[in-house]
Amino acid sequence: MTDGRGDLRVSGRPQPSASTRIVAVAWATAKVNRLPTILGYNLAYLLVGVGVAGGVAVDDLDLLAAYGLGVLLVKSQASIADAVHDRETDTENPSKSSVARSVAVLGRERALSLLVTELVVGLGLFGLVSTATGEPLYLAVGGALALAGFWYSYPPRLKEVGVVNHLVTTGADVVTGVVVVPVLLTGTVGRETLVVTTAVFLYAFGYHLVHQAADVYYDRHARVDTFARRVGTARTVGYAAVATGAAAGLCLALGYPGATAVTLGAALWYVSLYREVRREPLERQSELLADRFSVGAVATLLNAAMAVSVLLGLSDVSTVV
């Protein structure tokens, strides 16, 4: 039926237009894939790897693009798996409720179909890189990344295996973004790669910790037994400050003033957050961190600073290794 203006109505409510529905589905797809969060910092990870490799030849751009897209797709399908599995829990968490709503917009079956499609295409790209190079390493990396993403939300649920969760998720980010790229482009991993990788691992470990700390109040109510819930919000942020401060020290030793300044700034900011939340009640702690901290923005800034520093000053790394 229609009202006087010609708007379609069901039960007295105007129905959204086709274009509105398309936009809603597109945005929901981006949200369940966490693209607004992961796209920037994963691109920056890739650039760190390119810098450590000493650049990329024009002939290798297609392989690098295939590899990078494969990483993004396999990580994205893991985000969908987590969104579907934790939909009820996320509904109660203001910082994640939009993800739960996005799952509802898509529907569970459509979300799972998208997951399978991304997984197949992503692994196919890893296979393509392995075929082109004659090295099974890249397909193995893709398979390991897919398993880690699945196990994050489903048994053995890495998110509930204490600090092992952060070691695995941070390691997966850093290995796929920083370690494998030089192997793809040069065939080797130099000592300088290991030094840069250690710095990146430390600050990435830090922002993974703070990201989880923001959910402690809601995880407790949902009985999700995370590392941050076990040790407490403030202490988790304190650990992040220590790890990021150590990364700043490595950046200084590497002769990267830009990365040093940004990483040290992040460490000092974490100290400020620690001081702010430590005497607050648990719910307020989660609210403060959710308001102040965005893992996408922080990770992109830190990785971009490191990428620029490595690309501009790679030759200086050899002086400390």
Language-model segments: which ranges?
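Functional transmembrane core segments of multi-pass inner-membrane proteins
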Residues: 51-62, 169-216, 220, 234-235, ...
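Small-residue-rich segments of transmembrane alpha-helices in multi-pass membrane proteins
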Residues: 40-51, 166-183, 228-236, 288-308
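Haloarchaeal acidic low-complexity proteome signature biased toward cell-envelope/secretome components but also
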Residues: 1-32, 289, 321
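Multi-pass membrane catalytic core of lipid/isoprenoid biosynthesis enzymes
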Residues: 92-136, 225-256
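Extended hydrophobic alpha-helices typical of membrane-associated regions
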Residues: 235, 259-321
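Membrane-embedded alpha-helical segments that form the functional core of polytopic membrane enzymes
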Residues: 46-84, 136-150, 189-210
